[in-house]
A protein has these predicted regions:
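Cyclophilin-like peptidyl-prolyl cis-trans isomerases
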Residues: 1-140
């Protein structure tokens, strides 16, 4: 992960490709600045998060869809398959249509869970750095 000192010129255009890529548990999404400074939702070229999230029920998914409709003018919809995934595997449905998803963890979620529960500072950054020593990029 980068140190967070990139310039807006380093940002990457947003790309939303649901239902192929959405914020189910284990997916990678690009970090970004907030809508007030980044209304085009451009992605960081150096920072990302790994989605852990939660398991949803229909009421929570309906609430998420309302919020997503507000910021996408109704252009981004949770499909029945996405809803089922959120109700069984979990994730972060509230991020759909707002953050670019670009990959997934295929093994090692137990390590992600350790990172998730690490002690953090006032900016929600882990006190101790975590390093990814090995990653494999595959094409679907």
């Amino acid at each position: 992960m980068g140190e967070g000192d990139e310039k807006p010129s380093d940002w990457i255009p947003a790309e939303f490709r649901a239902p192929l890529f959405f914020h189910q548990r284990g997916m990678l999404n690009a970090a970004r600045e907030g809508d007030d400074t980044n209304p085009e939702k451009k992605s960081s070229s150096t920072q990302f998060t790994i989605v852990t999230g939660m398991v949803y029920d229909d009421a929570k998914l309906d609430n998420c869809q309302q919020r997503i409709d507000d910021w996408t003018n109704g252009t981004f919809k949770l499909t029945p398959e996405m809803r089922e995934t959120y109700k069984t595997i979990g994730g972060a449905a509230h991020l759909d249509g707002s953050y670019t998803v670009f990959g997934r963890v295929v093994s090692g979620m137990e390590v992600v869970e350790k990172i998730e529960h690490a002690t953090t500072d006032q900016h929600d950054r882990p006190i101790h750095d975590f390093r990814i020593n090995k990653a494999k990029i595959t094409k679907k």
